[in-house]
Amino acid sequence: MGFHTKSPDRVTHEEEANIGVDNQPRETTSTSLNRSQIIKTRNWWICIFVCSCLVVAGRVLSTLLLNFYFIQTGRDVCDDPKQFKGTWLQSMVQNAAFPFTAFLLLLWRSSFSTHSETSSSSSSFGKLFLLYISLGVLFAAYSQLYAIGRTHCVFFLWIFTSQLIFTSIFTTIINKQKFNRWIILSMVLSGAATGLGITSSGGAYIPCENEGSKMSNGAWCAFFGTVAFSLSLCIMQLGFQKVIPTTQSRVSAVILMQTNASMIATLICLVGLFVSGEFKDIKEDFETFKKGKPLYVLSLIGLSLAWQVMSLGLVGLVCLASSLFSNVVSFCSTPLVNILLVLAFRFTDADVKFFKEGALVAGILGFASYVYSLYKSTKKKEIASQSQTTRV
């Protein structure tokens, strides 16, 4: 299940040679190619499902643990100066679980490593290095900007929804993304799901509305954070299209990209943590954590792992489908995230049943709409491949 192609759209000349096109009857060759295409398509859909589950699970856990962290450190109290501290720590924790993905990479390569992967990666080292540096800087940028926007701007979640707009703009320019009515419908529904989901819940890190200057700074940080995140997704897709060697396993490429970019982002955030002096606040949080010191450490570890799992799923979806689909899946999970948030922390007392149900339906339909678009595209390519095989 090491998806070695971006999508199940064609059979390569090497694969044709392996099954003996020139030495077998046409009907046997056609049957072999069709069977190969069916297996490839099935594995591709399985990987789509797995990566989507990683995104949803990671987003749910990271949101719940982040709210738990804010409550237990006292950052949910309005007008408390502590509420605006610790942004560099948050951004560093968001990327710090790269040793986990590095272990997965070693495990994968020890089981499925090939010589062609190593030689191809070495030949394009310069381009790969530039790609990982760019992504690492963007990871660090949006992590820090989101951390500031989340704690300084009451409208953060509404600004966050513009992420889908920026992704669609960047992917059109950078990745030459083609749009159809199902993709557009999916974008509209996933945006509606996020909007209704925001209406139906709150959060422990929503700041006070009377902080004028902080509100303005937080809004701008949230805005530029969405730009940086959307740009990072599109650069990932460009990397898979133009930079990552086609001979390299897609699984290996996804994990390697996530590991290297997260490592660079962690180093940048670590420098920011010490330069800003925020490292001095860690001891206070550790000592005053309401549930005790062991749970403080465990909550940060769990939060970091949850964010890494979500990011790994996002990168996988970018590789398998597109940056836009990756963003849509994340947005469609918003209703589920907010429903679980309300159940876990009881942030909203008002009757918001209509908004929760509407958001959940919109999220499901938005995801289904994009999946149907992928299904139609895959079927069209299969038919084209079969007709081409018949003419051979």
Curated annotation (Swiss-Prot):
The chain crosses the membrane at residues 46-66, 88-108, 128-148, 154-174, 182-202, 220-240, 254-274, 300-320, 325-345, 354-374. Keywords: Membrane, Phosphoprotein, Transmembrane, Transmembrane helix, Transport. It is a multi-pass membrane protein. The keyword Transmembrane helix applies. It holds the Pfam family PUNUT. One of its GO terms (molecular function) is purine nucleoside transmembrane transporter activity. Residues 1-29 are annotated as: Disordered. This is Putative purine permease 19. Belongs to the purine permeases (TC 2.A.7.14) family. GO terms for cellular component: membrane. It is found in: Membrane. Residues 1-16 have a biased composition (Basic and acidic residues).
